[in-house]
């Protein structure tokens, strides 16, 4: 027997009706490739910016400064002997 005869093997074409091994469906809500399945796409919501509110900026700034000042005073009181 020659070398090429020993390495020859038969390849069987898979059946057209067989869909392969069973795989469980993805979890509910998991995105799939099927565009028809699932919820329709959400409509875009248009938002309107009201601009910059100077009062809100000053309130935030003053609150941050109070926090920094308080932490600075508290830390100096705690570290002094």
Curated annotation (Swiss-Prot):
GO CC terms, sorted: membrane; plasma membrane
Keyword match Transmembrane helix: yes
Topology term for the membrane: Single-pass membrane protein
Gene: PCC1
The protein's name: Cysteine-rich and transmembrane domain-containing protein PCC1
Source superkingdom: Eukaryota
Keywords: Abscisic acid signaling pathway, Cell membrane, Lipid metabolism, Membrane, Plant defense, Transmembrane, Transmembrane helix
Subcellular location per the Swiss-Prot or TrEMBL entry: Cell membrane
Similarity-based family: Belongs to the CYSTM1 family.
Transmembrane segments: 56-74
Annotated GO biological process: abscisic acid-activated signaling pathway; cellular response to UV-C; circadian rhythm; defense response; lipid homeostasis; lipid metabolic process; positive regulation of defense response to oomycetes; positive regulation of phosphatidylinositol biosynthetic process
Induction: Rapidly up-regulated after pathogen exposure (e.g. avirulent and virulent Pseudomonas syringae pv. tomato) in a salicylic acid (SA) defense-signaling pathway-dependent manner. Circadian-regulation with accumulation during the light period, peaks of expression at the end of the day, and low levels during the dark period. Up-regulated by UV-C light through a SA-dependent process and in a CONSTANS- (CO) dependent manner.
């Amino acid at each position: 027997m020659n070398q090429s005869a020993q390495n020859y093997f038969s390849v069987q074409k898979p059946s057209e009706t067989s869909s392969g091994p069973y795989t469980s469906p993805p979890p509910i809500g998991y995105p799939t490739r099927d565009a028809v399945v699932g919820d329709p796409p959400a409509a875009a919501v248009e938002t309107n910016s009201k601009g910059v509110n100077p009062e809100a900026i000053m309130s935030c700034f003053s609150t941050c400064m109070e926090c920094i000042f308080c932490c600075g005073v508290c830390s100096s009181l705690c570290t002094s002997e």
